[in-house]
Regions:
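Subset of outer-membrane beta-barrel
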Residues: 1-265
Length: 265
């Protein structure tokens, strides 16, 4: 995992609605505390969709256990807070005294907790995680009895494998399944082709939502850059022409000069 990885995502960058486009920004910082055992990190993610802004601040810890000479197991936990705010100035109401937000609690802090497990080797991985384990009530008014919503756990399952085609070229298929009740289960199917673990090209499919094209390169043992473009296939295609994503990874204190990601994952 890149250390000091910046990630910026505009989920609907092509929507012709100016500054109201959904927007996300994330920052992660990871540090290995000792040889092959402990890892700690910091994660900051901010998302904006219309008048609602959500910011997550989480500290993370993972323990890596060597199962065999080729297989490792990591178990991790993240804990922190989630800040949700509503900018009522961006809302036009038919009734200015709408009880749903009048005299409301427009800024809220909620606890956040997540756990995950990941088995990995040089050529494959499989993992599962849960985010938002702590269900929290959300409301933007002075009385929680008027309108109230609740956060629900997000379940993720992922797996991938590296299939060498030659000494220089490898295919890397992977899948990500997302389960969030009560919405339908969705999944991503991805396929990358890597050349000497230096650069890669690929594509992805997200169920009932989009197709994507991606490319990336390890510029050095400390820096890698990735780019992807999503072609929307859902009903949003009438107002969205696609989404651009750029990822920059920086690996600090890389004493062994390994490329990151080392195995193309």
């Amino acid at each position: 995992t890149p250390i000091g990885q910046n990630f910026i995502q505009g989920d609907a960058a092509a929507m012709p609605s100016g500054d109201s486009n959904p927007y996300g920004r994330g920052y992660t910082q990871n540090y290995t505390a000792s040889e092959s055992h402990h890892g700690v990190g910091l994660m900051i993610v901010s998302d904006k969709a219309g008048p609602i802004t959500q910011t997550n601040l989480n500290a993370t810890y993972a323990y890596h256990l060597t199962l065999t000479s080729k297989l490792n197991l990591a178990v991790g936990v993240s804990a922190g807070v989630n800040h949700i705010s509503l900018n009522t100035a961006e809302i036009t109401l038919e009734n200015p005294l709408d009880p749903a937000i009048a005299n409301g609690n427009n800024s809220q802090w909620k606890p956040d907790l997540g756990v995950g497990i990941w088995a990995y080797s040089a050529n494959y991985y499989v993992g599962a995680s849960v985010q938002q384990l702590l269900k929290q009530n959300l409301y933007f008014n002075s009385s929680s009895n008027i309108t109230q919503s609740q956060t629900v756990p997000h379940y993720f399952f992922t797996a991938g494998i590296k299939l060498p085609m030659s000494d220089d070229v490898a295919l890397l298929p992977s899948v990500l399944v997302k389960v969030i009740q009560p919405v339908p289960t969705t999944f991503d199917l991805n396929l990358k082709m890597a050349f000497r673990d230096i650069f890669w090209l690929g594509g992805s499919y997200r169920k009932d939502d989009s197709f994507g094209a991606l490319a990336g390169i390890n510029i050095s043992s400390g820096i890698n850059v990735g780019y992807s473009y999503d072609f929307t296939t859902s009903a949003l295609r009438t107002v969205s022409n696609g989404t651009h994503e750029i990822v920059i990874g920086i690996l600090l204190n890389n004493r062994y000069k390994v490329r990151c990601p080392q195995h193309g994952f």
